[in-house]
Amino acid sequence: MEIKKKQSTRKRSTARWIVVLLLLAVFLFSLYQTLRILYGYRQAKAVYENAERAYLIPVSRDETEAETERIPPAIDFEALRAVNKDVIGWIFIEGTEVNYPILLGANNQQYLFQSYEKKYTVAGSIFLDYRCGADFEDARTVVYGHNMKNGMMFGKLDRYQKADYLAEHPYVYILLAEGGWKKYRVLGCGQAAIDGETYDLPRSTEDADADRLLTLSTCTNDSRDDVRFVVNCVLEEVGTQNLDH
């Protein structure tokens, strides 16, 4: 009887250790995954902070210039395109994290997880739908970016759901690598089906007076496969000179 009791105790002890080891393994794996994700985010942030330092040309402003009239500095596209000829522009939204080069790949997967430096990054790049023209002259131009949890890329577009945020950040600027710039006014935001009208491209137009629309597209916060979160904008102003002139 005593022997059976010892065997039973030993089995329970072994089972406990197995459970402890399994829980420890799960914890260590979870810790590894968390650290890997955090490192990826930190690395991506550094990539685009370096891009701002390297390719944005600071512009001295008139002291009397109103904050609401501020416009983005010029971009050294010659140096930027020496790194990657797929760079076709730069997107900027005053007072937000959106301040990135725009890429145009052979398809819509090429720059999902590749930076403008052609290196892997969890944040990927901001990129134009491959069916759209690099001159942004289509009836609708779609630009994609990841919905990053740290707010990078298009990670804060959902804030346009709030009226006060829209009022504070009403314009999207596109600086073109071939010269000139475009200023878009934000119309609104919402969800769009991936097989819906928004992504029915290309939509070229020969009507010079027709509205040119810009759609910024990212994943929804719940990562649904059938819809995307979009911010729709309309072209309001076009410039042929650098924005610092």
Question: Which residue ranges define each predicted feature?
Answer:
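Solvent-exposed, non-transmembrane regions of membrane-associated and secreted proteins
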Residues: 27-245
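N-terminal Lys/Arg-rich, disordered targeting/topogenic segments
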Residues: 1-13
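Alpha-helical transmembrane segments
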Residues: 11-28
